[in-house]
């Protein structure tokens, strides 16, 4: 499911609504929850629960779903993969063991919804949320995933059924050089420059450009955005070897401020930012990508 060929199959059906316009408050009504029976996920990954006692350890969380779709007098589409990124989290943001337990013991199902005339199916976690949790799906309770699967066009005008046949939780430990916003007071309402790479994925938060760091902390404005926009062509994306759907950006050490972020030096000591993306994500940089301001605190929304 993590392979490029499988993801390309998935992409045939993908035309999701914009990240900013959909997903923030899409909760299943309580009267519908009592009638749903979900499945629990299997687990794959390189999880070491001893890491839960180390505050500077980061993990990437992903759910991979398999969905079968069928309609009257239509050929059944079996095994359509849905790649469902949950986010990247460090131990100082929330205990690792508690997060994994909440994800693995949760019950998941799928629902249909319509947005701008298009029909979608969406994987949901049933139950209540953890208000302060950095992973949006756990924080919001029965929050639907922000990445949705479009119903193939030949099913759009017919009655159809869909079935969630498999769900896998993948937990991947990030290398030691990972940069994350720090746990000190700056994380609260501090805004960082960020790159928006996909309408249904959260922006990639970056350290501040050194010249703009003080101004950004005191009064966020267009300064950090212009500073980042001017150097996007210098940023290069690398696929992390032996990791699924995980990429990194090595930032110029003489250009970015890392004082407010956790970082273990590698090579020249440049900060390294990790993010989740589909396996076929282009590696030719961030030219023409949208630059936004985003909160360092993942429980707050980007603007």
Swiss-Prot record:
Membrane is among the record's keywords: yes
Single GO molecular function: structural constituent of virion
Keywords per UniProt: Host cell membrane, Host endosome, Host membrane, Host-virus interaction, Inhibition of host innate immune response by virus, Inhibition of host interferon signaling pathway by virus, Inhibition of host JAK1 by virus, Interferon antiviral system evasion, Membrane, Viral budding, Viral budding via the host ESCRT complexes, Viral immunoevasion, Viral matrix protein, Viral release from host cell, Virion
Places the protein is found: Virion membrane; Host late endosome membrane; Host cell membrane; Host endomembrane system
Keyword Membrane included in the entry's annotation: yes
GO biological process, one term: symbiont-mediated suppression of host innate immune response
PPXY motif, short sequence motif: residues: 16-19
InterPro entries assigned to the protein according to its UniProt record, in alphabetical order: EV_matrix, EV_matrix_protein_N, EV_matrix_sf
Domain notes: Late-budding domains (L domains) are short sequence motifs essential for viral particle budding. They recruit proteins of the host ESCRT machinery (Endosomal Sorting Complex Required for Transport) or ESCRT-associated proteins. VP40 contains one L domain: a PPXY motif which potentially interacts with the WW domain 3 of NEDD4 E3 ubiquitin ligase and the three WW domains of SMURF2 E3 ubiquitin ligase.
Note: Most abundant protein in the virion.
Described purpose of this protein according to its UniProt entry: Plays an essential role virus particle assembly and budding. Promotes virus assembly and budding by interacting with host proteins of the multivesicular body pathway. The interaction with host E3 ubiquitin ligase SMURF2 facilitates virus budding. The interaction with the nucleocapsid and the plasma membrane may also facilitate virus budding. Specific interactions with membrane-associated GP and VP24 during the budding process may also occur. May play a role in genome replication.
Family per record: Belongs to the filoviridae matrix protein VP40 family.
Listed name of the protein: Matrix protein VP40
Source species of the chain: Lake Victoria marburgvirus (strain Ravn-87)
Gene symbol of the encoding locus: VP40
């Amino acid at each position: 499911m993590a392979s490029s060929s499988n993801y390309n199959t998935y992409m045939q059906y993908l035309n999701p609504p914009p990240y900013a316009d959909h997903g923030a408050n899409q909760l299943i009504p309580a009267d519908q929850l009592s009638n749903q029976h979900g499945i629990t996920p299997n687990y794959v990954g390189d999880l070491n629960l001893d890491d839960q006692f180390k505050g500077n350890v980061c993990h990437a969380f992903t759910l991979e779903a398999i969905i079968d779709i069928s309609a009257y007098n239509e050929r059944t589409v079996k095994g359509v993969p849905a790649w469902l990124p949950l986010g990247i989290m460090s131990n100082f943001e929330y205990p690792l063991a508690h997060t994994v337990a909440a994800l693995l013991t949760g019950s998941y199902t799928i629902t249909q919804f319509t947005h701008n005339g298009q029909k979608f199916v969406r994987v949901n976690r049933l139950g209540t949320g953890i208000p302060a949790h950095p992973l949006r799906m756990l924080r919001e309770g029965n929050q639907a995933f922000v990445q949705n699967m479009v119903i193939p066009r030949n099913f759009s005008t017919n009655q159809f059924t869909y079935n969630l046949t498999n769900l896998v939780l993948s937990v991947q430990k990030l290398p030691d050089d990972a940069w994350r916003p720090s746990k000190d007071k700056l994380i609260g309402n501090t805004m960082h420059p960020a790159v928006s790479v996909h309408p249904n994925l959260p922006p990639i938060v970056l350290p501040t450009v050194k010249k703009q760091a003080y101004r950004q902390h005191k009064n966020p404005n267009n300064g950090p955005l212009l500073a980042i926009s001017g150097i996007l062509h210098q940023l290069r994306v690398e696929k992390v070897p032996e990791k699924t759907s995980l990429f990194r950006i090595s930032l110029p050490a003489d250009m970015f401020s890392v004082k407010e972020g956790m970082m273990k030096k590698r090579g020249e000591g440049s900060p390294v930012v990790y993010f989740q993306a589909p396996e076929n994500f282009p590696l030719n940089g961030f030219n023409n990508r949208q630059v936004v301001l985003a909160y360092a605190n993942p429980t707050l929304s980007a603007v």
